[in-house]
Amino acid sequence: MATLIQQVESLPAAYPTAPVGLSSAVAALVKVSWQRIEPYIAWRFTPRAVTWTVEGPGEWHPPLQPATISAVEIWSGADEWEAVTVAASPLGGYCLPATGPYRFTAEVGGGVAPDIVQEAVKRLAEYLAAEPDMPGATSERTEIPGVMTSEVSRIASWRARAMQNSGAADLLRPYRRA
Protein backbone atom coordinates (compact mmCIF):
# COMPACT_ATOMS: atom_id res chain seq x y z
CA MET A 1 0.00 0.00 0.00
CA ALA A 2 1.40 3.39 -0.99
CA THR A 3 1.68 6.10 1.66
CA LEU A 4 0.41 9.66 1.43
CA ILE A 5 3.24 11.98 2.52
CA GLN A 6 1.67 15.39 1.92
CA GLN A 7 -1.61 16.94 0.81
CA VAL A 8 -1.77 20.59 -0.25
CA GLU A 9 -5.34 21.73 -0.82
CA SER A 10 -6.15 25.25 -1.99
CA LEU A 11 -9.17 27.14 -0.71
CA PRO A 12 -12.21 27.18 -2.99
CA ALA A 13 -13.30 30.39 -4.69
CA ALA A 14 -16.63 30.02 -2.86
CA TYR A 15 -18.49 27.52 -0.73
CA PRO A 16 -21.90 26.08 -1.65
CA THR A 17 -24.82 28.44 -1.15
CA ALA A 18 -26.53 28.56 2.22
CA PRO A 19 -29.61 26.41 2.78
CA VAL A 20 -32.87 28.36 2.52
CA GLY A 21 -34.81 29.54 5.55
CA LEU A 22 -31.91 30.56 7.79
CA SER A 23 -31.94 33.59 10.05
CA SER A 24 -29.36 36.27 9.23
CA ALA A 25 -27.28 35.30 12.30
CA VAL A 26 -27.17 31.67 11.19
CA ALA A 27 -26.59 32.53 7.50
CA ALA A 28 -23.55 34.60 8.52
CA LEU A 29 -21.96 31.43 9.92
CA VAL A 30 -22.49 29.17 6.89
CA LYS A 31 -19.00 29.84 5.49
CA VAL A 32 -17.46 29.09 8.90
CA SER A 33 -19.54 25.91 9.06
CA TRP A 34 -18.26 24.78 5.66
CA GLN A 35 -14.70 25.53 6.79
CA ARG A 36 -15.19 23.24 9.79
CA ILE A 37 -17.06 20.52 7.89
CA GLU A 38 -14.68 20.13 4.93
CA PRO A 39 -11.68 18.91 6.98
CA TYR A 40 -14.06 16.46 8.67
CA ILE A 41 -15.21 14.79 5.43
CA ALA A 42 -13.51 13.36 2.33
CA TRP A 43 -15.87 14.96 -0.20
CA ARG A 44 -15.71 18.45 -1.70
CA PHE A 45 -18.63 20.20 -3.37
CA THR A 46 -16.84 23.23 -4.85
CA PRO A 47 -13.79 22.88 -7.11
CA ARG A 48 -10.26 23.60 -5.95
CA ALA A 49 -6.71 22.48 -6.76
CA VAL A 50 -4.94 19.84 -4.72
CA THR A 51 -1.51 18.25 -4.87
CA TRP A 52 -0.67 14.93 -3.24
CA THR A 53 2.85 13.60 -2.68
CA VAL A 54 2.79 9.82 -2.36
CA GLU A 55 5.48 7.25 -1.65
CA GLY A 56 5.18 3.85 -3.31
CA PRO A 57 5.24 1.12 -4.20
CA GLY A 58 1.70 -0.11 -4.01
CA GLU A 59 -1.88 0.87 -4.67
CA TRP A 60 -3.01 4.42 -3.90
CA HIS A 61 -6.42 6.12 -3.98
CA PRO A 62 -7.04 9.87 -3.86
CA PRO A 63 -8.25 10.68 -0.32
CA LEU A 64 -10.65 13.40 -1.54
CA GLN A 65 -13.58 12.93 -3.93
CA PRO A 66 -14.55 13.66 -6.61
CA ALA A 67 -11.00 13.98 -7.98
CA THR A 68 -9.81 14.56 -11.53
CA ILE A 69 -6.08 13.85 -11.81
CA SER A 70 -4.42 16.14 -14.36
CA ALA A 71 -0.75 15.18 -13.90
CA VAL A 72 1.35 12.46 -12.30
CA GLU A 73 5.06 13.01 -11.80
CA ILE A 74 7.92 11.11 -10.18
CA TRP A 75 11.00 12.54 -8.49
CA SER A 76 13.87 11.49 -10.74
CA GLY A 77 17.55 10.78 -10.22
CA ALA A 78 18.17 14.21 -11.78
CA ASP A 79 16.54 15.80 -8.72
CA GLU A 80 13.49 17.09 -10.56
CA TRP A 81 9.87 16.11 -11.19
CA GLU A 82 9.31 14.17 -14.43
CA ALA A 83 5.97 13.20 -15.98
CA VAL A 84 5.13 9.53 -15.61
CA THR A 85 2.23 7.28 -16.54
CA VAL A 86 0.96 4.95 -13.83
CA ALA A 87 -1.41 2.05 -14.34
CA ALA A 88 -4.92 1.96 -12.94
CA SER A 89 -5.46 -0.40 -10.04
CA PRO A 90 -8.26 -2.98 -9.97
CA LEU A 91 -10.03 -1.08 -7.17
CA GLY A 92 -10.12 2.28 -8.96
CA GLY A 93 -6.90 3.86 -7.72
CA TYR A 94 -3.39 3.83 -9.11
CA CYS A 95 -0.60 1.22 -9.04
CA LEU A 96 2.71 2.83 -8.16
CA PRO A 97 5.47 0.47 -9.33
CA ALA A 98 8.45 2.17 -7.65
CA THR A 99 9.27 3.98 -4.43
CA GLY A 100 8.93 7.43 -5.98
CA PRO A 101 7.94 9.79 -4.49
CA TYR A 102 5.09 10.64 -6.85
CA ARG A 103 3.27 13.94 -7.16
CA PHE A 104 -0.39 13.90 -8.21
CA THR A 105 -1.92 17.19 -9.34
CA ALA A 106 -5.71 17.26 -9.40
CA GLU A 107 -8.88 19.24 -9.14
CA VAL A 108 -11.28 18.03 -6.49
CA GLY A 109 -14.84 19.01 -5.82
CA GLY A 110 -17.92 19.69 -7.82
CA GLY A 111 -21.52 18.74 -7.98
CA VAL A 112 -24.32 19.69 -5.65
CA ALA A 113 -24.05 19.11 -1.92
CA PRO A 114 -26.60 16.43 -0.94
CA ASP A 115 -29.50 17.45 1.29
CA ILE A 116 -28.03 15.60 4.27
CA VAL A 117 -24.76 17.57 3.99
CA GLN A 118 -26.72 20.83 3.70
CA GLU A 119 -28.64 19.83 6.83
CA ALA A 120 -25.34 19.24 8.65
CA VAL A 121 -24.15 22.72 7.61
CA LYS A 122 -27.43 24.18 8.86
CA ARG A 123 -27.24 22.34 12.21
CA LEU A 124 -23.66 23.39 12.80
CA ALA A 125 -24.36 27.03 11.89
CA GLU A 126 -27.42 27.10 14.18
CA TYR A 127 -25.40 25.61 17.03
CA LEU A 128 -22.58 28.12 16.58
CA ALA A 129 -25.06 31.02 16.37
CA ALA A 130 -26.72 30.10 19.67
CA GLU A 131 -25.85 32.51 22.42
CA PRO A 132 -24.44 30.85 25.51
CA ASP A 133 -26.72 31.27 28.51
CA MET A 134 -23.80 31.95 30.79
CA PRO A 135 -20.94 33.78 29.10
CA GLY A 136 -17.63 32.77 30.61
CA ALA A 137 -19.17 30.37 33.13
CA THR A 138 -19.39 26.61 33.09
CA SER A 139 -22.36 26.37 35.44
CA GLU A 140 -25.10 28.58 36.79
CA ARG A 141 -27.55 27.97 39.60
CA THR A 142 -30.71 29.96 40.17
CA GLU A 143 -32.70 29.37 43.33
CA ILE A 144 -35.87 30.89 44.67
CA PRO A 145 -36.16 29.33 48.15
CA GLY A 146 -39.22 27.16 48.50
CA VAL A 147 -40.31 27.83 44.90
CA MET A 148 -37.76 26.50 42.41
CA THR A 149 -34.16 25.64 41.76
CA SER A 150 -32.59 25.65 38.32
CA GLU A 151 -29.06 24.50 37.54
CA VAL A 152 -27.50 24.63 34.10
CA SER A 153 -24.00 23.51 33.24
CA ARG A 154 -22.05 23.50 30.03
CA ILE A 155 -18.64 21.98 29.43
CA ALA A 156 -15.93 24.52 28.68
CA SER A 157 -15.23 22.96 25.28
CA TRP A 158 -18.81 23.29 24.00
CA ARG A 159 -17.80 25.26 20.87
CA ALA A 160 -14.89 22.93 20.13
CA ARG A 161 -17.30 19.97 20.17
CA ALA A 162 -19.89 21.74 18.04
CA MET A 163 -19.63 19.20 15.20
CA GLN A 164 -20.66 16.38 17.54
CA ASN A 165 -23.02 18.30 19.83
CA SER A 166 -24.98 19.83 16.93
CA GLY A 167 -25.66 16.45 15.35
CA ALA A 168 -23.76 17.39 12.17
CA ALA A 169 -21.15 14.66 12.70
CA ASP A 170 -23.78 11.91 12.66
CA LEU A 171 -25.21 13.18 9.38
CA LEU A 172 -21.76 13.37 7.79
CA ARG A 173 -20.70 9.82 8.67
CA PRO A 174 -21.20 8.47 5.09
CA TYR A 175 -18.91 11.21 3.73
CA ARG A 176 -15.94 10.56 6.05
CA ARG A 177 -14.21 8.23 3.56
CA ALA A 178 -13.52 8.65 -0.14
Predicted regions and their residues:
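Generic low-complexity segments that are intrinsically disordered, proline-rich and/or Lys/Arg-biased
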Residues: 13, 17-20, 58, 63-67, ...
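Short loop/turn elements at secondary-structure junctions
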Residues: 2-6, 112-178
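Extracellular/luminal ectodomains and secreted, surface-exposed scaffolds of diverse proteins
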Residues: 74-99
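Surface-exposed interaction regions enriched in Ser/Thr/Asp/Glu
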Residues: 90-118
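Glycine-enriched, solvent-exposed interface loops adjoining structured elements
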Residues: 1-76
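Residue-level marker of positions within ordered structural domains that often coincide
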Residues: 38, 77, 109, 130
